[in-house]
Regions:
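Short, small-residue-biased leader/transition segments that mark boundaries at the very start
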Residues: 5-21
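Short, flexible active-site loop motifs that bind/organize anionic cofactors or intermediates
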Residues: 7-10, 27, 44, 83, ...
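Hydrophobic core positions of alpha-helical segments in small-molecule transporters
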Residues: 14, 60, 135-138
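Alpha-helical membrane segments and immediately flanking helix-loop junctions
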Residues: 23-73, 98-115, 141-157
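Transmembrane alpha-helical segments and their short flanking loops
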Residues: 74-174
């Protein structure tokens, strides 16, 4: 039987959802994790994160926490390898995951930066970089979704760190 986890945020679900909606709409339309930072900071604080934690975690997350980009690069690389007629082994797929994860850490939080890193992952896997043109036309739509996933991870991290810090402070006080 699974144990039910306590809520990370102390606010009601409807008000928390409206705050998240604002930042997700802005992130989706701008496709920029860095551009979303001001809205993200204020909304994350409204959700219950400490200002000090949010001010540290969110800019760091906007720089290196690119979950959506890592997932996209893996899926796009496997898709483009299949389009080339390549059959990937398990070892090659693991290499793609590791390379895409490392590349996503170095990706800038600006629109379109993931495509540049995707070219690097394709080259590392000996897939013709020209194949990137197959997905280039729809990448902007994917970029919007990736940004929403990236900032959701940043928000979750800030709320979890606040919760853990509060628990640690309470344990230290005893």
């Amino acid at each position: 039987r699974m144990r039910r986890l306590p809520p990370v945020s102390t606010r009601g679900r409807s008000s928390a959802a409206s705050d998240v909606d604002k930042r997700l709409i802005f992130a989706f339309s701008s496709a920029s994790s860095v551009g979303t930072l001001p809205i993200n900071l204020s909304c994350t604080e409204k959700l219950g994160a400490k200002k000090e934690v949010a001010s540290f975690v969110l800019p760091l997350g906007a720089t290196i926490n690119m979950d959506g980009t890592a997932i996209y690069q893996c899926v796009a690389t496997i898709f483009l390898a299949t389009c080339c007629g390549m059959t990937l082994t398990l070892g090659q797929m693991v290499t793609i995951v590791v390379t895409a994860t490392l590349a996503s850490i170095g990706t800038a939080g600006t629109p379109g930066a993931g495509m540049i890193m995707l070219a690097m992952v394709l080259q590392a896997m000996n897939i013709p970089v020209d194949m990137i043109m197959i997905i280039y036309g729809v990448d902007r739509l994917f970029d919007m979704g990736r940004t929403c996933l990236n900032i959701t991870g940043d928000i979750s991290c800030a709320l979890c760190v606040t919760k853990w810090e509060s628990k640690k402070t309470a344990q230290t006080a005893k």
